[in-house]
């Protein structure tokens, strides 16, 4: 088991506050999350905004710039999921996101997540220094095979029911990290800990941190 299990706040802390909002991200940061996870979409006028839905409703979706302003609150990592729902190549979207990362000089504090491995391949091409995380939710493939397909991503983020100790050990042997999603029940946290994962993505980072502290893992 890693010496420190990293806590990733899913969409901030959606068990406590409205997801993908500045308030949820601030809450997760203040409670001690190591990373805040968020979904990114591209608007028709070229704005990168934080939203789970590809079609935006009128509402207070924060811009990526707004969320990057929170960087001064700590040394946490930004888990940026680039959501792409088109057969077209995502080059433009990736370039917009990378431009913002460079503008804010946050290359060392972001990890790019995606289910669409084209996104990860483009990011790897233009910014090889930025960490990549391959999201996966189906299949029995070894995590190192998933990472290889995903532009040699450094981290694999599987749906947590896919996690086994054997898969995690094989991933670690290949110098990969495993960070499952979205894990919210204490019994499932314990199962992930027993499997040896490196971090956990959860809707309730405060509760997970308390759970880890009670077990001397924080």
Regions found by a protein language model. Give the residues of each.
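Phosphate-group recognition and catalysis centered on beta-loop-alpha active-site segments
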Residues: 1-218
């Amino acid at each position: 088991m890693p010496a420190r299990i990293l806590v990733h706040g899913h969409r901030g802390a959606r068990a406590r506050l409205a997801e993908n909002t500045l308030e949820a991200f601030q809450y997760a940061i203040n409670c001690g999350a190591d990373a805040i996870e968020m979904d990114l979409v591209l608007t028709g006028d070229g704005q990168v905004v934080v939203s789970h839905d590809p079609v935006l409703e009128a509402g207070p979706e924060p811009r990526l710039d707004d969320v990057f302003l929170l960087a001064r609150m700590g040394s946490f990592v930004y888990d940026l999921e680039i959501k792409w729902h088109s057969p077209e190549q995502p080059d433009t979207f990736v370039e917009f996101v990378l431009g913002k990362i460079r503008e804010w000089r946050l290359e060392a504090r972001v990890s790019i997540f995606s289910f669409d491995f084209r996104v990860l391949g483009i990011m790897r091409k233009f910014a090889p220094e930025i960490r990549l995380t391959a999201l996966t939710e189906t299949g029995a493939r070894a995590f190192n095979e998933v990472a290889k397909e995903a532009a040699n991503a450094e981290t694999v983020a599987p749906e947590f029911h896919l996690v086994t100790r054997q898969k995690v050990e094989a991933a670690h042997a290949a110098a990969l990290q495993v960070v499952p999603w979205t894990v919210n029940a204490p019994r499932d946290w314990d199962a992930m800990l027993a499997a040896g994962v490196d971090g956990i993505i959860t809707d309730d980072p405060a509760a997970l941190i308390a759970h880890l502290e009670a077990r001397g893992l924080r």
